[in-house]
Amino acid sequence: MKVYVLLVFLTLCSAKPLFHPSYLTLKNLMLKDMEDEGDSDADNSLFPTREPINPFFPFDLFSTCPFGCQCYSRVVHCSDLGLSSVPSNIPFDTRMVDLQNNKIKEIKENDFKGLTSLYALILNNNKLTKIHPKAFLTTKKLRRLYLSHNQLSEIPLNLPKSLAELRIHDNKVKKIQKATFKGMNALHVLEMSANPLDNNGIEPGAFEGVTVFHIRIAEAKLTSIPKELPSTLLELHLDYNKISVVELEDFKRYKDLQRLGLGNNRITDIENGSLANIPRVREIHLENNKLKKVPSGLQELKYLQIIFLHSNSITKVGVNDFCPTVPKMKKSLYSAISLSNNPVKYWEVQPATFRCVLSRMSVQLGNFRK
């Protein structure tokens, strides 16, 4: 018996400390995020080196922490607790608050009062229907706000001017008001897919003065490409909408665009010359549409490397549809051309058609099924 007890004791003493994987993963992600962001604050680090983390005690056991939550290195982790409201006693020096997967219905005026160092706020997958106009009055350093999978009917007004990334995917937003992003010069990423937004819901001037680089409005009710999005766009994703035609003037405003997503729409025609307005584009998604031919102008896009055209109604591929006809024209080699699941007879496609691809593995043909 004594030997058994001794063995158990030795086993417990030699056991490694228990870490929850999500804590360390979350910390690493936020560290990388802060490095990428290049925050110019005097206190640049989310996990300051002057407060080293003891691997045997990953949580700060002595500071104030909301009941049921876990606090460590200026991160307050309160997800998956069934909370119906934002907890009190969040430390004032908190940099990140994780409240996802709860049952919070409302953000009140003082829920985040005094959190002047808050950098990221995660409220995904709650039941939010209302956010007080003054809820973010003191969070002047907030850079990332995640509100996806809630029941918000509009984008909150009076968001912090410091915000760089807003994700409000899968809500009930039908309108983007003119004043929504006023003064938000730091906003670079806007993700608002899976909202019942149509073209009339984007008020004229809604994006005036903002320098957004990435916008995703997929799974919405758009019937055409919005023409008044920021001219600074590098990525535009409008997949899973109801767009039927790409008109000549649709991309005239977006000359710096590098990635374009128009997959899973109803596009039957791309007007000649329309793609010439995005000369810097590198990747185009047009899969799962109703195109009957390869869009014209691809051979003139010297930076284009990826083009997805699978699952359309393309019956013919010309020898000059993808590659330049001018021998001296320098063009990036294609790393992916997807033409699979089209009624084109692949044995009729001339080998010279793909003379500007990286390798034959870069081309996908065949597998058409009626």
From Swiss-Prot:
Keywords: Disulfide bond, Extracellular matrix, Glycoprotein, Leucine-rich repeat, Repeat, Secreted, Signal. It is found in: Secreted, Extracellular space, Extracellular matrix. It comes from the Eukaryota. SUPFAM superfamilies: L domain-like. This is Asporin. LRR repeats lie at residues 93-114, 117-138, 141-163, 164-183, 186-209, 232-253, 256-277, 280-302, 303-324, 332-354, 355-370. Residues 56-92 form the LRRNT domain. It comes from Bos taurus. Disulfide bonds join 65-71, 69-78, 323-356. It holds the Pfam family LRR_8. Transmembrane segments: none annotated. The gene is ASPN. GO terms for biological process: bone mineralization; negative regulation of tooth mineralization; negative regulation of transforming growth factor beta receptor signaling pathway. Glycans are attached at residues 45, 272. Residues 1-15 form the signal peptide. Its main location: secreted. Belongs to the small leucine-rich proteoglycan (SLRP) family. SLRP class I subfamily. One of its GO terms (molecular function) is calcium ion binding. One of its GO terms (cellular component) is extracellular space.
